[in-house]
Regions:
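Signature of the chorismate-utilizing enzyme
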Residues: 1-196
């Protein structure tokens, strides 16, 4: 944690910070990618909506794209239990990319399914220390179509080839707005991080 300061009680403060960071060029350039990820807690304050998190500029991401597959020849109705199954979930390729004035491919990780692929990413992550919030984990989004890599389903209508199905960032930097405590914390897992 870099800094801790008290802020006024405003639920949308993290949005103002995001705008300010954009205006000051703190996303992209020398600090990392211009990609943004905001996990915004709005609505009534509770233990389930206590914090909003803004990821700082990413330096590494993991992408899964839709592979080339043949559509299922069996046409059925899943609502009537007519589901075309295969022996195993579809294997996957996770493209590891680093930011260097653009995303560049570093390696490809092959997984027999989603769980196997994600387990292979564990060596990219810092070791967890305690149970408090810490930077350096994975954050991003997975589309519904990733189910082909968790269940042995064969799609009747697969996504377009090369569509992005998953994008996870190595989230080394976070700005955390605690709405209940009215504080801002800045976390980084990067030694001597110039962005912080």
């Amino acid at each position: 944690m870099k800094a801790l300061c008290e802020v006024e009680e405003r639920d949308d403060l993290i949005l103002d910070l995001l705008t300010q960071l954009r205006d000051e060029g703190m996303f992209g350039g020398i600090h990392g990618a211009p990609d943004e990820l905001l996990l915004h807690s709005g609505g009534p304050q509770s233990d389930l909506s206590q914090r909003s998190l803004l990821m700082g500029p990413a330096r590494r991401r993991y992408i899964v794209r839709q592979p080339s597959i043949e559509s299922s020849s069996a046409i059925g109705s899943p609502l009537r239990g007519e589901i075309d199954l295969q022996p195993h979930p579809a294997p996957m390729k996770i493209h590891v990319e680093n930011w260097d004035d653009g995303w560049t491919s570093q390696e490809i990780i092959f997984g027999t399914d989603l769980a196997d692929g994600l387990r292979q990413l564990s060596h990219h992550l810092p070791l967890a220390q305690g149970d408090a919030f810490q930077a350096g984990g994975l954050a991003g989004l997975l589309t519904y179509d990733m189910v082909q890599h968790t269940e042995p389903l064969r799609f009747q209508h697969p996504p377009d080839e090369d569509s992005i199905l998953m994008i996870l960032y190595l989230a080394d930097r976070w700005i955390v707005h605690d709405r209940i405590e009215s504080t801002i914390e800045i976390h980084s897992s990067i030694d001597n991080d110039g962005w912080v």
